[in-house]
């Protein structure tokens, strides 16, 4: 009996562990929130008391480089300050513009879906200016913000980068249609408690701030201040996985659909005074002292300059590059900013995770309700990534009945589809995994859904659960030749925290060490690894024992090759299970691409005819006709299935309704694997007289209504039969009504002609009368 009870208890424990990773654990999150509230209150009280005694500044502006604010004390009773890390280019850099309404992808994503409201949050240094015309009516302020005046310029700028409507098109936010965002101020240091509470409902939140570390120039003291321990050459907080980092990982583990995005920091150009110059430092009692800078203190200008909790495993940390205004084409397009903080973490993990545009980014600010300004910093790079990833969740939800990706899937997808950056293939400690490519990520979602993750699909997205002593294994046969890439991502349990007295010694933070392998023709392919002892060295292949993201790339796979992807684990899994996300991109069929021989738009009578001729359609799924009145915003008007032959095929779609002025047309061509291309744009000019009126309905039974689309003041309407005999004639004033009704119930069935004459010309249309 005892064995059965034990077995039952093990089953219950197994189920609880699995549920914690796949469903939001509200009970655990409530406990974390309560603990963090108490901790923040006590720490804040202690810090305020010590500030009065030791003359620490409570807050100060850093002359265009953000601000710092006292939020507590650290493990050594030194003051702990939060500091902020001071959109068309940003959107182009990460390939998000194409996802917007009117964009080339045709996906029309802007965050406006009803189920996305209040699923995005921002924590920042003060209050967002809710009355700014880019944001008005969409901000929900969740706390009694520290800044109760006209708002914070930094918080307003960051929020605008995520959601500004685009009244100024150059400052349009990534999720510009989102109807509601939650905003918090970080003034009291209780942001982690607030995040814990909101993680039950949020999908993403942005955090463009972090602990002040290393060097900072204080206007309060009029001097450079070294924030590290006296006698240390490097601030131990750089790369340090502290208690807050562990808490953030715990939150993510219990809220598996919530992803926190954080800025990496701007410390590489905060270098302190010259050697021998006067500087301030904190002694062992936390009292500020003054001395001459010794030779050995670091300039913070290289690797391992990301502070404390921004080194957490389960968050997404973002660095800053210069904008790529015309869009990415090659790795050298990515130019590193002078300030963006680099990895690795103390235990050698890859940070930052991704990079985005953070140099001279235009967004709204709080000067007045229509003001804008350009800021630089990882603070500006992070919100563009946050807003872009939010659109991926919107798209996934559309295709999956309102359900969302797990955060590990979203993070893994962003990394998997990122554009290469840096001097060598693979990840590095400067650019992380590269530049977010939001269009390719959206394509992966579309293709994996349309193919139901078939083994022949170009893109596959899998969410699964691994148990102890189990190996996930799946075999594929390549349908084409080229590069194969697989990415494994998982939300790892919180790692161990060490309290340190000096620059901390490395300790591995990875708890559940999963392994990704690809086996082809008896050869095992390993993931990328970096060497933290030589941080500038290029990535190599090997056993990654540090990161909770692994990626295997095979540069050359031949059509017909069989390969097996395996996911396993070392040792014993914490809790007995580990949820994971697997992303795969494999080369597709090598059949010849579609050849679009011609595409023409012609005005026929009073409507447009579109005709196109193709060849090599074997891989083509369909053609969607799109129209536009401005050449930017496109609407689907008709869909035609491809004939899927190698010979020439001719297509024609007639009677396309038109509007006065220039009408634009193009073809959206979808391949079998879900990838999309576009034809050239064709235009048709419609004079005002050609579009004078429309007949609804046509054919007509009892009544036919003429709808006038003209600026004419008066027109004459003549109805005649096929013999030219006038059935009805009427002079109309369009100043009182733009419609006219013809009774057709008493007319014999057949064809009739309606002629409308006005000052701009004469238009005749055919009317068909039928009687049911």
Question: Locations of the language-model features?
Answer:
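Subtilisin-like serine protease catalytic core
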Residues: 21-24, 91-205, 210-222, 253-259, ...
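C-terminal tail/sorting-segment detector
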Residues: 20, 672-689, 729, 749-772
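Short, surface-exposed loop/turn motifs with a glycine/proline- and acidic-biased composition
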Residues: 641-665, 732-759
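Hydrolase catalytic cores
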Residues: 355-424
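Short, compositionally biased serine/threonine- and acidic-rich segments at solvent-exposed termini, linkers
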Residues: 583-690
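N-terminal domain-start motif of subtilase-like serine proteases
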Residues: 25, 30-33, 37-122, 142-151, ...
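Secreted peptidase-domain scaffold signal
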Residues: 434-512, 582-588
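Catalytic-core environment of secreted peptidases
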Residues: 123-135, 321-383
């Amino acid at each position: 009996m005892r064995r059965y009870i034990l077995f039952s208890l093990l089953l219950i424990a197994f189920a609880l562990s699995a549920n914690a990773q796949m469903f939001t654990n509200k009970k655990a999150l409530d406990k974390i929130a309560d603990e963090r509230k108490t901790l923040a209150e006590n720490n804040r009280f202690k810090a305020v008391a010590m500030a009065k005694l030791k003359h620490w500044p409570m807050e100060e502006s850093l002359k265009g480089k953000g601000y710092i604010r006292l939020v507590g004390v650290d493990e050594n009773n030194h003051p702990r300050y939060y500091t902020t890390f001071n959109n068309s280019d940003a959107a182009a850099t990460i390939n998000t513009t194409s996802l917007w309404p009117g964009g080339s992808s045709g996906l029309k994503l802007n965050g406006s879906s009803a189920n996305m409201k209040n699923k995005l949050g921002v924590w920042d240094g003060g209050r967002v200016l809710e009355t700014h015309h880019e944001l008005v009516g969409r901000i929900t302020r969740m706390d009694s913000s520290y800044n109760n005046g006209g708002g914070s310029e930094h918080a307003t700028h960051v929020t605008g980068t995520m959601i500004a409507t685009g009244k100024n098109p150059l400052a349009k936010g990534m999720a510009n249609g989102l109807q509601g965002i939650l905003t918090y101020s970080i003034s009291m240091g209780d942001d982690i408690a607030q995040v814990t509470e909101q993680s039950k409902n949020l999908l993403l939140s942005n955090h463009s701030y972090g602990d002040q570390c290393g060097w900072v120039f204080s206007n309060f003291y009029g001097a450079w201040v070294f924030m590290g321990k006296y006698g240390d050459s490097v601030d131990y907080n750089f790369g340090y996985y502290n208690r807050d980092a562990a808490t953030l990982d715990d939150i993510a583990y219990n809220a598996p659909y919530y992803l926190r995005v954080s800025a990496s920091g701007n410390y590489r150009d905060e270098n302190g005074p010259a050697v021998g110059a006067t500087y301030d430092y904190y002694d062992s009692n936390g009292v500020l002292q003054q001395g001459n800078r010794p030779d050995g203190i670091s300039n913070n200008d290289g690797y391992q300059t990301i502070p404390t909790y921004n080194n957490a495993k389960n968050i997404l940390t973002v660095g800053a590059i210069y904008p790529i205004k015309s869009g990415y084409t090659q790795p050298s397009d990515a130019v590193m900013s002078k300030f963006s903080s680099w990895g690795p973490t103390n235990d050698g993990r890859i940070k930052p995770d991704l990079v985005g545009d953070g140099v001279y980014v235009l967004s709204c600010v709080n000067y007045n309700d229509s003001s804008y300004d350009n800021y630089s910093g990882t603070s500006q790079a992070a919100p563009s990534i946050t807003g872009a990833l939010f659109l991926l969740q919107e798209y996934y939800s559309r295709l999956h009945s309102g359900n969302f990706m797990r955060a590990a899937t979203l993070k893994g997808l962003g990394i998997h589809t990122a554009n290469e950056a840096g001097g060598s293939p693979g990840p590095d400690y400067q650019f992380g995994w590269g530049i977010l490519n939001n269009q390719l990520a959206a394509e992966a979602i579309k293709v994996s859904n349309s193919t139901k993750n078939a083994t022949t699909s170009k893109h596959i997205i899998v969410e699964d659960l691994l148990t102890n002593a189990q190996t996930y294994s799946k075999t594929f046969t390549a349908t084409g030749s080229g590069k194969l890439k697989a990415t494994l991502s998982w939300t790892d349990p919180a790692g161990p925290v060490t309290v340190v007295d000096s620059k901390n010694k490395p300790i591995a933070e990875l708890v559940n060490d999963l392994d990704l392998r690809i086996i082809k023709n008896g050869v095992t392919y390993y993931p990328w690894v970096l060497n933290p002892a030589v941080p500038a060295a290029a990535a190599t292949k090997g056993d990654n024992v540090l990161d909770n993201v692994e990626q295997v790339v095979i540069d050359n796979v031949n059509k017909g090759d069989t390969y097996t992807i395996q996911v396993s684990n070392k040792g014993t899994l914490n809790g007995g299970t580990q949820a994971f996300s697997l992303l795969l991109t494999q080369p597709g069929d090598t059949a010849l691409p579609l050849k679009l021989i011609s595409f023409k738009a012609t005005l026929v009578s009073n409507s447009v005819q579109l005709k196109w001729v193709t060849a090599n359609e074997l891989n083509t799924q369909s053609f969607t006709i799109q129209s536009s009145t401005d050449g930017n915003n496109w609407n689907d008007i008709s869909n035609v299935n491809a004939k899927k032959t190698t010979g020439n095929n001719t297509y024609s779609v007639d009677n396309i309704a038109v509007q006065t002025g220039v009408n634009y047309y193009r073809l959206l061509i979808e391949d079998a694997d879900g990838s999309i291309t576009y034809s050239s744009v064709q235009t048709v000019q419609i004079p005002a007289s050609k579009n004078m009126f429309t007949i609804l309905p046509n054919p007509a039974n009892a009544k036919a209504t003429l709808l006038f689309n003209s600026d004419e003041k008066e027109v004459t309407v003549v109805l005649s039969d096929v013999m030219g005999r006038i059935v009805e004639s009427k002079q109309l004033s369009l100043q009182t009504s733009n419609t006219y009704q013809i009774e057709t119930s008493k007319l014999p069935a057949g064809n009739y002609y309606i002629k409308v004459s006005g000052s701009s010309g004469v238009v005749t249309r055919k009317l068909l009368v039928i009687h049911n």
